[in-house]
Amino acid sequence: MVAAGAGVTRLLVLLLMVAAAPSRARGSGCRVGASARGTGADGREAEGCGTVALLLEHSFELGDGANFQKRGLLLWNQQDGTLSATQRQLSEEERGRLRDVAAVNGLYRVRVPRRPGTLDGSEAGGHVSSFVPACSLVESHLSDQLTLHVDVAGNVVGLSVVVYPGGCRGSEVEDEDLELFNTSVQLRPPSTAPGPETAAFIERLEMEQAQKAKNPQEQKSFFAKYWMYIIPVVLFLMMSGAPDAGGQGGGGGGGSSR
């Protein structure tokens, strides 16, 4: 008995320790109650508890293939639902390549992992991507807007990129205008449909039932309510019609005797 009691005590202690252990937000890279952290180069660590990083990559190649390289990080604060971006400057070689791709009407592609706080591989769960004509990005002086669409589980389900003002008009662009991205970012959480007003419906139903219980007369039929008026009228009609029927019968008999 003593050994069994000691075993139960140890089991309870272990359960309490597991329950009290700090949990890690799944896929967010943020511990509950953790202090602020710096963002690593690989995007695994976030700036603070509740903030996760997504590796933002881009690709602009002369061929049909894609060769994604790091463009920066998208920082998603899951506590207040805000999104921000940190991006690196384009090198001279990248600026020249972007011009070459724009000259042949090539594409500029961007992508982020589906699971925030993860790198390439099986943990990332794949990527979501978008693209615009490279010439429109060049003529916008690298001014674009990134919109991140997420689901209720915190996974990325969509990414869109729009450049301003857009279009390819063949305008001349200075090299210094292609050094830094001028990016605005926004987060699109899932839209929840309005649920049924179950509580209001139940409350209204209970009020109707209570009202019916207070006024049982309302449950009676039309005849049950007005029988004292209906019966005299029926009797009057029956009695007033009886002499007419007798008179018509007598007149018919006299005619046949002649």
Curated annotation (Swiss-Prot):
Residues 26-221 are lumenal. CDD domains: EMC10 (cd22209). Residues 1-25 form the signal peptide. One of its GO terms (biological process) is tail-anchored membrane protein insertion into ER membrane. GO terms for cellular component: EMC complex; endoplasmic reticulum membrane; extracellular region; membrane. The chain crosses the membrane at residues 222-242. It comes from the Eukaryota. Keywords: Angiogenesis, Endoplasmic reticulum, Membrane, Secreted, Signal, Transmembrane, Transmembrane helix. Disruption phenotype: Knockout mice show no cardiovascular phenotype at baseline. After myocardial infarction however, capillarization of the infarct border zone is impaired and the animals develop larger infarct scars and more pronounced left ventricular remodeling and systolic dysfunction compared with wild-type mice. Part of the endoplasmic reticulum membrane protein complex (EMC) that enables the energy-independent insertion into endoplasmic reticulum membranes of newly synthesized membrane proteins. Preferentially accommodates proteins with transmembrane domains that are weakly hydrophobic or contain destabilizing features such as charged and aromatic residues. Involved in the cotranslational insertion of multi-pass membrane proteins in which stop-transfer membrane-anchor sequences become ER membrane spanning helices. Component of the ER membrane protein complex (EMC). Belongs to the EMC10 family. This is ER membrane protein complex subunit 10. It comes from Mus musculus. The gene is Emc10.
